[in-house]
Amino acid sequence: MAGGKAGKDSGKAKAKAVSRSQRAGLQFPVGRIHRHLKTRTTSHGRVGATAAVYSAAILEYLTAEVLELAGNASKDLKVKRITPRHLQLAIRGDEELDSLIKATIAGGGVIPHIHKSLIGKKGQQKTA
C-alpha cells in the first residue's frame, strides 16, 4: 500500500474527461485561452475560471460572424474559396465590425468608393 489509494477506486470505472470547451458548448479551446490569459497578465496575475469561458465565447462569436459575412461575399462573387479580399469586403461592409477591426488586411485591396461631390449631375456636361 505504498500509493495510499490502492483499494479506494478499485471497483469503479473512471469517468471520461470532459473539456471545459465541451461543458460550455464551444469550439474554441477554453483551457488554452485561460493559459494565455494567465501568462499575459501583469506579474502572472490571477484569472477567474469563467473569464476564459467568456473570452472563448466572444472570440468564437466574432469569428463566426466574420466568416459568415466573408462566405456571403465569396458566394456573391461566385467562388468557393474565401480570400483576404472577401474578408476585407465583409469587415468594411459591416459598420460595427469596421469600427471594431481597424487592422490592415494583407491582400485585401481597397473598398470602392466615390465621393458624392465628385459625381456629376445627369445632363450636366463638362465643356472644354
UniProtKB/Swiss-Prot annotation:
<keyword id="KW-0158">Chromosome</keyword>
<feature type="modified residue" description="N6-acetyllysine">
    <location>
        <position position="12"/>
    </location>
</feature>
<dbReference type="Pfam" id="PF00125">
    <property type="entry name" value="Histone"/>
</dbReference>
<comment type="subunit">
    <text>The nucleosome is a histone octamer containing two molecules each of H2A, H2B, H3 and H4 assembled in one H3-H4 heterotetramer and two H2A-H2B heterodimers. The octamer wraps approximately 147 bp of DNA. H2A or its variant H2AZ2 forms a heterodimer with H2B.</text>
</comment>
<feature type="compositionally biased region" description="Basic and acidic residues">
    <location>
        <begin position="1"/>
        <end position="12"/>
    </location>
</feature>
<comment type="similarity">
    <text>Belongs to the histone H2A family.</text>
</comment>
<keyword id="KW-0238">DNA-binding</keyword>
<feature type="modified residue" description="N6-lactoyllysine">
    <location>
        <position position="116"/>
    </location>
</feature>
<dbReference type="GO" id="GO:0005634">
    <property type="term" value="C:nucleus"/>
</dbReference>
<feature type="modified residue" description="N6-lactoyllysine; alternate">
    <location>
        <position position="12"/>
    </location>
</feature>
<feature type="region of interest" description="Disordered">
    <location>
        <begin position="1"/>
        <end position="23"/>
    </location>
</feature>
<keyword id="KW-0007">Acetylation</keyword>
<dbReference type="GO" id="GO:0006325">
    <property type="term" value="P:chromatin organization"/>
</dbReference>
<dbReference type="InterPro" id="IPR032454">
    <property type="entry name" value="Histone_H2A_C"/>
</dbReference>
<protein>
    <recommendedName>
        <fullName>Histone H2A.V</fullName>
    </recommendedName>
</protein>
<keyword id="KW-0539">Nucleus</keyword>
<dbReference type="InterPro" id="IPR007125">
    <property type="entry name" value="Histone_H2A/H2B/H3"/>
</dbReference>
<keyword id="KW-0832">Ubl conjugation</keyword>
<dbReference type="Pfam" id="PF16211">
    <property type="entry name" value="Histone_H2A_C"/>
</dbReference>
<keyword id="KW-0544">Nucleosome core</keyword>
<dbReference type="InterPro" id="IPR009072">
    <property type="entry name" value="Histone-fold"/>
</dbReference>
<dbReference type="GO" id="GO:0030527">
    <property type="term" value="F:structural constituent of chromatin"/>
</dbReference>
<feature type="modified residue" description="N6-lactoyllysine; alternate">
    <location>
        <position position="14"/>
    </location>
</feature>
<dbReference type="GO" id="GO:0000786">
    <property type="term" value="C:nucleosome"/>
</dbReference>
<dbReference type="GO" id="GO:0046982">
    <property type="term" value="F:protein heterodimerization activity"/>
</dbReference>
<dbReference type="GO" id="GO:0031507">
    <property type="term" value="P:heterochromatin formation"/>
</dbReference>
<dbReference type="GO" id="GO:0070062">
    <property type="term" value="C:extracellular exosome"/>
</dbReference>
<dbReference type="GO" id="GO:0003677">
    <property type="term" value="F:DNA binding"/>
</dbReference>
<dbReference type="GO" id="GO:0060090">
    <property type="term" value="F:molecular adaptor activity"/>
</dbReference>
<dbReference type="InterPro" id="IPR032458">
    <property type="entry name" value="Histone_H2A_CS"/>
</dbReference>
<dbReference type="InterPro" id="IPR002119">
    <property type="entry name" value="Histone_H2A"/>
</dbReference>
<feature type="modified residue" description="N6-acetyllysine">
    <location>
        <position position="8"/>
    </location>
</feature>
<comment type="function">
    <text>Variant histone H2A which replaces conventional H2A in a subset of nucleosomes. Nucleosomes wrap and compact DNA into chromatin, limiting DNA accessibility to the cellular machineries which require DNA as a template. Histones thereby play a central role in transcription regulation, DNA repair, DNA replication and chromosomal stability. DNA accessibility is regulated via a complex set of post-translational modifications of histones, also called histone code, and nucleosome remodeling. May be involved in the formation of constitutive heterochromatin.</text>
</comment>
<feature type="modified residue" description="N6-acetyllysine">
    <location>
        <position position="5"/>
    </location>
</feature>
